[in-house]
Regions:
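Active-site-adjacent loop/helix surface patches within enzyme catalytic domains
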Residues: 2-97
């Protein structure tokens, strides 16, 4: 079964610096997927955040950043001796008010 993605182009990404070996799952805490998409694609310097995917409450999958690129979803982070979690992970946002 192939997954169908709704494609978007978030400006909030840069070059991945390491191989992918983690998934990071977040929840949005925003009322609607429309609000979440607007936030994740806002290119204003003070709002620069993104994820590779947003999964809507109805199951639709929005792709915002290509997997070969580094989305900005984990902030300044550290896990099990690894720094720069953004570079080694795929970020998935679950729409959840």
């Amino acid at each position: 079964m192939a997954l169908a993605f709704i494609e978007h182009a978030s400006p909030n990404f840069d070059v991945r610096k390491s191989a992918i070996d983690m998934l990071v799952v977040h929840y949005t805490g925003m009322k609607t997927a429309t609000e979440s998409l607007a936030r994740l694609m806002d290119g204003a310097i003070e709002n620069r955040v993104s994820a590779h995917y947003l999964i809507d409450e109805d199951g639709r999958i929005h792709r915002l950043v290509q997997e070969e690129d580094r989305a900005w979803h984990a902030g300044v982070s550290y896990w099990a001796g690894v720094r720069d979690i953004n570079s080694c992970s795929i970020g998935i946002e679950l729409q959840n008010p």
